[in-house]
Amino acid sequence: MRVPLSWLREYVDLPATETGRDVQAKLISAGLEVETVEHLGADLKGPLVVGQVLTIEELEGFKKPIRFCTVNVGQANGTGEPQEIVCGARNFAVGDKVVVVLPGATLPGGFSISARKTYGKTSHGMICSSDELGMGDDGTHGIIVLPPETEVGKDAIELLELVDEVLDIAVTANRGDCLSIRGVARETAIAYGLPLRDPALLDVPGPNAYGYPVKIADPTGCDRFTARTVTGLSAEARSPIWLQRRLQKVGMRPISLAVDVTNYVMMELGQPLHAYDRSLVQGTIGVRRAQEGEKIVTLDGTERKLHAEDLVITDDRGPIGLAGVMGGANTEIADHDAAENGGNATSDVVIEAAHFDQVSIARTARRHKLSSEASRRFERGVDPQAAAAAAQRTVDLLVLLAGGTAEAGVTEISAPSAPHTISVPADHPDKVAGVEYGRETVVRRLQEVGCDVYGQDELIVTVPSWRPDLDDINDLAEEVIRLEGYENLPSTLPRPPAGRGLTSRQRLHRRVGRALAGAGYVEALNYPFVGEQVFDQLGLDADDPARRVVRLVNPLSDEEPALRTSLLPGLLAALRRNDGRGAHDLALFETGLVFHPRDEQRVAADLPVDRRPSEDDLAALDAALPDQPRHVAVVLAGAREQAGWWGKGRPADWADAVESARTVAREARAELGVRKGQYGPWHPGRCAELFVTVDGEERVVGHAGELHPRVLKTLGLPARTCAMELDLDALERVGDDIPQAPGISTFPVATQDVALVVDAFVPASEVEAALREGAGELLESIRLFDVYDNAEQLGEGRKSLAYALRFRAKDRTLTVDEASAARDAAVALAGERVGAVLRS
């Protein structure tokens, strides 16, 4: 919404020293988004005067028609002599009043005017068009021709209001009242604490039986319709300069007097209007829904096929306008140009000022891709009480400017409606803002926006008709807070109650993320949506529980209509994208929720919004949610350690995936078991099953290892890609939430290395478990540091596993014999359990 400061001053007595920037700051403080302040005529300098064309000499011999004119500018040139000017325009004649810029002046854009020789003549100035003066398009595309009564020599800068400031306001969807000068003036008056001269306060005659007949068939779509008639409009009447300039400043193009007046009143009061040529309207004006197959040619010359939900204005022939959007060409106003071309100029008009349903107008405008100034206002909300005043204002201007006669008949049809009232505690704004405003301030601010307020501790507030956005107590609180100034709200740090903070689940989530990042993994956050074809790509069995998914009612993509049951699809897709873009050495991780439908999945009930949900309501909502455990997963490909002068490096392998699971388990302070496994996407010979022990029973919580070559090929992944996925919530349940500080012994450690030869199919985890149990309580740690599988030295189907054993006693220094005895016991049990023998 463009708001000229000069127009704003008509309704608010702003201090003379206030600039557009000052008003901008005030309105921004009050909550309006004033984006820019345009300075019209900022670099314009006179003399710029009204002149009268005395003579015109046609110059010949040039590529385009050129005229040499003498123009009377009065005493503006200091001599009183006619001014000689060369001009190429053709839309003026001898006797016309024009705008003349004299030597020494500067036009917008820094264009300086001086006497210069051109086309064999000396031109002492220039006859101006609207574009050259920065006025925009006036529809003539030529020289400005002023009304005959304009005084010669008058200052054209003042006459044409060329110097002004225009505020450009981005009006939000809830503030339709600010799509008018009246609405912005009201906000300005409040911001400055000044009275408002409301242009809608007019003496409006009441409805009677003599008005133009109107019938409303759809009172839901149109709850108010005012019709007024003006006859005897002069065919020669044109929009005065001040009206044209105001329309240009707000961004509209002058068209004809009747149309310009309706546009002017719309910009002034915010009420869209439409003028029909009375001679072209046949019978009763009606408001109804369109019928299938009906068509209308709108004012832009486009034939439109109507939809059954379109609200239309009709006469006895059919549609004559798209209600609230655009009028029809079959009742269009004909101006003086039509009369000059042999047609009949409109002399009698019917003025429509109506109130239409917001949703209906918005849908019609979008359906026909036809956004207009009228539809923009109806979509955001128009004051239904302004229709009669807007119609009266239009009638008054047409009578004043076009010499018309206002007929006595007044048609006004309105559906009964009660004003909207809200009961609000007087201290509610205080509670919302955390500031003690007091009852007097709350009442004063609400009255300033137009509310009627009664009551003491409990206020009964009647909302003004122009503010349909004020719907509940929080809207009223917002009005008080914004008018008191958002910048005056104190900045205070939140003070949570003692004992609050992150939950144990949140702390574990963060610890795991930090640990994996420290181990060289990069976090990747993926969408939680999957397509069911991904389970086939991962090689899951037909009866695998992971195939049971929660489907979305309105998915973002038809290809991914379900919520994930595993983190791997998203992580593997991220790895594939990165690998395809040249990043081949990858280690990614993600912690996030997966979703499993419950056995008895319920549908969440629609809760009312006028009260806080009860505990039962919240419990019912929780029961309708799917199970959402938190998982952690990693994927690896390429080099795990880079090659360089320090060594050969090494590729990522299944052991890295298993180690990432152990890293997660350490952060959860849980005992994680590892054994040979086989599941879905993993290579059957290189898959580890991860488990925890709960009440003496082992429970599988994840898998780790190298992915199956078939899965890699199907998904387009690099060779030897490895992955791990764990149920993090399951680890949390068996873990110790209280961190245990490790005991620090003052006694030295005794290290013993053993290399055991076992069958190739024996998992290292089983060997390690036997060594731990056999070594007893003196064993502090065990680490596998070498795997060797030379058939010539070890025999066919055999491998060597080398472990570093660390022994330490809490109360003494171990002797060599004690450490050796513990080692021998460990080796003996490993031999008994898995057939391990010491490598010689």
From Swiss-Prot:
It is an enzyme of class 6 (ligase). InterPro entries: aa-tRNA-synth_II/BPL/LPL (IPR045864), B3/B4_tRNA-bd (IPR005146), DNA-bd_dom_put_sf (IPR009061), Fdx_antiC-bd (IPR005121), Fdx_antiC-bd_sf (IPR036690), NA-bd_OB-fold (IPR012340), Phe-tRNA-ligase_IIc_bsu (IPR045060), Phe-tRNA-ligase_IIc_bsu_bact (IPR004532). It catalyses: tRNA(Phe) + L-phenylalanine + ATP = L-phenylalanyl-tRNA(Phe) + AMP + diphosphate + H(+). The lineage of its organism: Bacteria, Bacillati, Actinomycetota, Actinomycetes, Kitasatosporales. One of its GO terms (molecular function) is tRNA binding. It comes from Streptomyces coelicolor (strain ATCC BAA-471 / A3(2) / M145). This is Phenylalanine--tRNA ligase beta subunit. Tetramer of two alpha and two beta subunits. Residues 417-491 form the B5 domain. The gene is pheT. It comes from the Bacteria. Belongs to the phenylalanyl-tRNA synthetase beta subunit family. Type 1 subfamily.
